[in-house]
Amino acid sequence: MLPTAVLLVLAVSVVARDNTTCDGPCGVRFRQNRQGGVRIIGGQDAAHGAWPWMVSLQIFTYHNNRRYHVCGGSLLNSQWLLTAAHCFRIKKKVTDWRLIFGAKEVEWGTNKPVKPPLQERYVEKIIIHEKYSASSEANDIALMKITPPVTCGHFIGPGCLPQFRAGPPRVPQTCWVAGWGFLQENARRTSPMLQEARVDLIDLGLCNSTRWYNGRIRSTNVCAGYPEGKIDTCQGDSGGPLMCKDSAENSYVVVGITSWGVGCARAKRPGVYTSTWSYLNWIASKIGSTAVHMIQLPTASPASTPGAQASSGSVQPSVRPPWFFQQIT
């Protein structure tokens, strides 16, 4: 049970004052792809500005001044973004990273400066969850402090987080994923174009069942995809958002962080995400309660989470490997 005082402190307004400082409305899509077709795997190119809180996390190599996209992230405000802890298994120094905001297309291994409306920023601090486990992917969540602060505008804006009282995301519902990851499981490079795809939230009991993930799913996870596979996040999408629409506010809420999976787009092996709702207290403790935008979401029914037990730790997920460090030369 979360303290009442924390709940009151974290009842954060989403009313705009100055959008350039990222204090404006959160979760607002500036543009949408109206084609509705369906490559993420099984997705489509996203329109520029469709997901303005999307951030490209790029490894910076000093010997040739080149940048390589390796993970995604979600902008929370002008100074902080949310991503996955496993993105930092090898590269943990702030000087190893560059952040690109407002992008639709990212170029692999470029040494060219970005041009407006894109913005490039450095990293001041990386905060990895204290109980993150690389073997089980428990607590796969991290924060990055941006320097200098990013300026929000037409293609850049903050994402929303769920409020405490929202509870876990409601199942069933159709949500969205986005990223620059692989377009097929055996690809060798990430997609240059931002991809988006609709995915269904999957009951954790089903996701944790014998023929699915067989006890590997934790109560702090969200599963999303389809029983037959075919549409999924993949390598390079890690750290990016799983987003559900709040119909009352007409905003999108980041309910999950792309974490792990067995292969990509396989049947009965949907994407596994870190539930942001489970870590709201942790996020607020690191960046301050007034620094996050929150939106109420429909509460999950009690029947939607049976079988979502914390893993014993003896069963380890076949986590998508840190492929990107082998590809960068």
Swiss-Prot record:
Keyword Hydrolase (UniProt): yes
Query: Mind listing the GO biological process terms from this record?
Result: acrosome reaction; activation of adenylate cyclase activity; proteolysis; single fertilization
Annotated control of activity: Inhibited by SERPINA5.
GO (cellular component) term, any one: acrosomal vesicle
The record places the active site at: H86 (charge relay system), D140 (charge relay system), S238 (charge relay system)
Please name the PROSITE patterns in this protein's record: TRYPSIN_DOM, TRYPSIN_HIS, TRYPSIN_SER
Under the GO molecular function aspect, what terms does this record hold? amidase activity; D-mannose binding; fucose binding; serine-type endopeptidase activity; serine-type peptidase activity
**Which keywords are on file for this protein?**
Disulfide bond, Glycoprotein, Hydrolase, Protease, Serine protease, Signal, Zymogen
Stated EC number for the protein is 3.4.21.10
Domain (Peptidase S1): residue spans on this chain? 40-288
Tell me which residues are glycosylated: N19, N208
| Record's catalysed reaction(s) | Preferential cleavage: Arg-|-Xaa, Lys-|-Xaa
Describe the function of this protein.
Acrosin is the major protease of mammalian spermatozoa. It is a serine protease of trypsin-like cleavage specificity, it is synthesized in a zymogen form, proacrosin and stored in the acrosome.
Family statement:
Belongs to the peptidase S1 family.
Q: What is this protein called?
A: Acrosin
Which taxonomic lineage does the organism of this UniProt entry have?
Eukaryota, Metazoa, Chordata, Craniata, Vertebrata
Gene name, Swiss-Prot/TrEMBL: ACR
